[in-house]
């Protein structure tokens, strides 16, 4: 399978894929198949700005699981799979599941609040918002080790620096150009939600680790069965990675060199990720 402890990820036949990442891919694919072969459109689960006022809590928490078509699903999975797998291997399977729920709901509330004024009839679905959130989360942490992603030398006296912290915004603009029907607001709120995660502003919304450990103990038989085909990253093991070890940079680079760069280039900014917006039904 893929070794997500390295970047770019490398194929390792001895590894099984992360449980949550694999399950999300399979589950959303099945939903896409159901939508394609039946007349059910999941209309009630499209996120519209009025969802909080209408108390449509299902759309606020589940809109990201559904897609317009297979192409939309493939694009989102291609964007999300690697960062989600990296996050899961470092933070634990259940912790990652809680994170996805928090990112989904927080981004949805931002989208709805602003949308009531600027795009009241525009709905969104899809996983790209979460993808942009994880992108911004990683961009924030990567910026501590590699503040500048790339420097473009336009002439002897002119150069443009692409700061790692701003990469998600660049990606969002590129998506807007390549896919005009995509939701720029959705992507931007995915990015801001990723920053909230990065700066620790939503940490208090997580359940205590003891609760997660208790759940894992009660589901131990099911977890042992799943580990025949996937890797389940348990809370006790992941606490070490999240706590004492800290963030491990994706790109191979000397940490002291990265720290020196960070000091010389000043403070960091924001990063993030999301997806599609349209007239009546957009893709996030």
Swiss-Prot record:
GO terms for molecular function: serine-type endopeptidase activity. Disulfide bonds: none annotated. Its EC number is 3.4.21.105. It is found in: Golgi apparatus membrane; Golgi apparatus, cis-Golgi network membrane. Keywords: Golgi apparatus, Hydrolase, Membrane, Protease, Serine protease, Transmembrane, Transmembrane helix. The chain crosses the membrane at residues 17-37, 66-86, 98-118, 124-141, 160-180, 182-202. The active site is at 128 (nucleophile), 187. It catalyses: Cleaves type-1 transmembrane domains using a catalytic dyad composed of serine and histidine that are contributed by different transmembrane domains. It is a multi-pass membrane protein. Its main location: Golgi. GO terms for biological process: proteolysis. GO terms for cellular component: Golgi membrane; nuclear periphery. SUPFAM superfamilies: Rhomboid-like (SSF144091). Pfam families: Rhomboid. Belongs to the peptidase S54 family. Probable rhomboid-type serine protease that catalyzes intramembrane proteolysis. This is Rhomboid-type serine protease 2. It comes from Candida albicans (strain SC5314 / ATCC MYA-2876) (Yeast).
